[in-house]
Every structure is written in structure tokens, then in C-alpha cells.
């Protein structure tokens, strides 16, 4: 019997923990604050920012939103980030990607103070993650860990394959899986577009994390019997629907569920955890910066 992992249920539990911690902080006169910065006309980016603002409102986190003309010089964005770095009411800063080419993603990430980098992508925070002393774990990989934990899926001693090597998911996911402690101690292989014999590697895995951004690339033929399959992908494909498309993951769900012992659907699997973990990191940032302890599991 295959278990379909319910990301909404797990995400709701994390939000409850975050809400309790927000209350603890507020009782001590600290209101967690998250600043979102948008320098794009992209509709999907606007939607993502709106979802993050809504989550803040629901959990009692102060949301500060800033929009910058995509044609503006890079210095306009950098000056705004500097202002937010200096603002004691702002505990977390998130610049929604992508940013225009003339700005550059790396320059933006370097500009945010590490203590306020609640995405966990500043070089200092990446280094701390690799060293096993993470300040803020990147939201999506941390969310995957929470899903595995919630469903009592053991990682210790298991063979894990991460398909995808992005800075956002693939690399940090692999780093979390190899760390000592709960949710880690796995023997981890990272595969990517240049990997030879991908199907052989995934068939030898106890846990497969698909994060390549290729629709339905993983099917049952690429899996071992009883594998745990975590689908991080979210892709729009043409479909005969009212919107003209449907969302699918990097895994062929209908095929893979016939072999998997546990699998995440798309949507409703990993997605709800990404924003929940952003709220988690924001509250952790407020706790670290204010010195008020909170009980975040």
C-alpha cells in the first residue's frame, strides 16, 4: 500500500508551531517582520510574493512589501536592501527571484545581511549549512526533511539520490541528507543533466528526491520496489483545462505510485512546506536577533 504524503497537513502543523512562537515573541514586545522585495513584472513572481504576504498575515508576522521598477539601476535595489538591513523591525529579507540581468542574483544574495537571509542563500549561510551548523536551512530542502520526519521515514544508512543540482534545492538537499543527526546520515548521490545512467542510479536508491524541473522524468521503471519518492518539481504543461495547462511534478505520479512505498503529489506535496519553512525561518530570525527564546522544533 503506497502512502501519499500530505504536505498540507504537515505544513499546517508547522504553521501552528510558528504561530505559538510568534505569540511568545509578541508577549516579549517583539513582532517578527519579513520584508519582501519584488523587482519584476513576472506574474508568477507576484503570485509567490502575495502568498508569502498572506502567510505572514495569518500567523501574526509583520509583512513589509517593496516593489522596484525592473528598469531601475541595480543601485536602487541595493540601497533598499541596505535600508532593510539596518531596520530593526525587519528580521528577514526576501528578494523574489528572478531579478533583472543587469542586477544579478549573486550580487543580491551577497548584499543581504546573513542574519536576515531567511532563504539561507548568503554565502555565509551556505557555508554554515555545509559545515553542519546551519543558521537557516533553505526552505524547500528543510521542508522535505520535515515531511520525511512527519511520516517516520528513516534516512540513516539509506541510499538517497537527489536529481538536480540547483543552489535552491539540489545542493542544499544533498547537504542536509549527509549531515549527522535526524533527517541525515544518508549515503547521497547527486545527479544532473550530465549524469550517465541516471535510471540505474535511481533504481538503486531507497529515497529519490526529484528536483530537476523536467516534467514527469521519473517513472516506475526508474525506481526500486518500495522506494520513497519526493517530488519537488512543479511544471506547467499544456492541457485541455479551463486554464489551458495543468501542474505536474518531475515524477510521473500515476506510474511511480505503483512501486513507491511513499510519494508526494504535485500539487499538495512539497509546495506547502516551502512557505511554512519561510515563516519558520523568519520567526527563528526574530528570536536570534531579539534574544527571546522560542520553542521551534
Spans of model-derived segments:
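Glycine-rich phosphate/diphosphate-binding loop of Rossmann-like nucleotide-binding domains
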Residues: 39-41, 46-50, 135-232, 243-255
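Active-site cofactor/substrate anionic-group-binding motifs, chiefly glycine-
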Residues: 45, 49-89
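Short beta-strand segments
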Residues: 38, 94-98, 231
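N-terminal glycine-rich anion-binding loops that anchor highly charged ligand groups
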Residues: 23-34, 40-58
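Rossmann-fold NAD(P)-binding glycine/threonine-rich loop
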Residues: 105-119, 126, 230-296
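Positively charged, low-complexity intrinsically disordered leader regions
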Residues: 1-30
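Short glycine-rich anion-binding loops that position phosphate/pyrophosphate groups of nucleotides
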Residues: 96-102, 214-216, 234-237
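Anion-binding alpha/beta catalytic cores of soluble intermediary-metabolism enzymes, centered on
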Residues: 94-155
Amino acid at each position: 500500500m503506497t502512502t501519499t504524503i500530505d504536505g498540507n497537513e504537515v505544513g499546517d502543523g508547522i504553521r501552528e508551531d510558528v504561530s505559538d512562537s510568534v505569540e511568545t515573541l509578541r508577549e516579549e514586545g517583539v513582532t517578527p517582520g519579513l520584508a519582501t522585495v519584488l523587482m519584476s513584472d513576472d506574474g508568477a513572481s507576484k503570485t509567490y510574493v502575495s502568498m508569502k504576504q498572506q502567510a505572514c498575515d495569518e500567523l501574526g508576522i509583520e509583512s513589509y512589501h517593496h516593489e522596484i521598477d525592473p528598469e531601475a539601476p541595480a543601485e536602487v535595489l541595493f540601497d533598499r536592501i541596505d535600508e532593510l538591513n539596518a531596520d530593526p523591525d525587519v528580521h528577514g529579507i526576501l528578494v523574489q527571484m528572478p531579478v533583472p540581468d543587469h542586477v544579478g542574483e549573486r550580487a543580491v544574495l551577497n548584499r543581504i545581511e546573513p542574519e536576515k537571509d531567511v532563504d539561507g542563500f548568503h554565502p555565509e549561510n551556505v557555508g554554515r549549512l555545509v559545515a553542519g551548523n546551519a543558521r537557516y536551512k533553505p526552505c524547500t530542502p528543510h521542508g522535505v526533511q520535515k515531511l520525511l520526519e512527519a511520516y517516520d521515514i528513516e534516512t540513516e544508512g539509506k541510499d538517497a539520490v537527489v536529481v538536480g543540482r540547483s543552489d535552491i534545492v539540489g545542493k542544499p538537499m544533498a547537504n542536509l541528507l549527509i549531515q549527522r543527526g535526524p533527517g541525515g546520515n544518508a549515503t547521497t548521490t547527486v545527479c544532473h543533466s550530465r549524469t550517465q545512467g541516471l535510471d540505474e542510479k535511481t533504481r538503486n536508491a531507497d529515497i529519490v528526491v526529484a528536483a530537476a524541473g523536467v516534467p514527469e522524468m521519473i517513472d516506475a521503471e526508474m525506481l526500486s520496489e518500495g522506494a520513497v519518492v519526493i517530488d519537488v518539481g512543479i511544471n506547467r504543461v499544456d492541457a485541455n483545462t479551463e486554464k489551458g495547462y495543468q501542474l505536474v511534478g518531475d515524477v510521473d505520479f500515476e506510474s511511480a505510485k505503483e512501486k513507491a512505498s511513499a510519494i508526494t503529489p504535485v500539487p499538495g506535496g512539497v509546495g506547502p512546506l516551502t512557505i511554512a519553512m519561510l515563516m519558520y525561518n523568519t520567526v527563528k530570525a526574530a528570536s536570534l536577533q531579539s534574544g527571546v527564546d522560542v520553542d521551534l522544533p
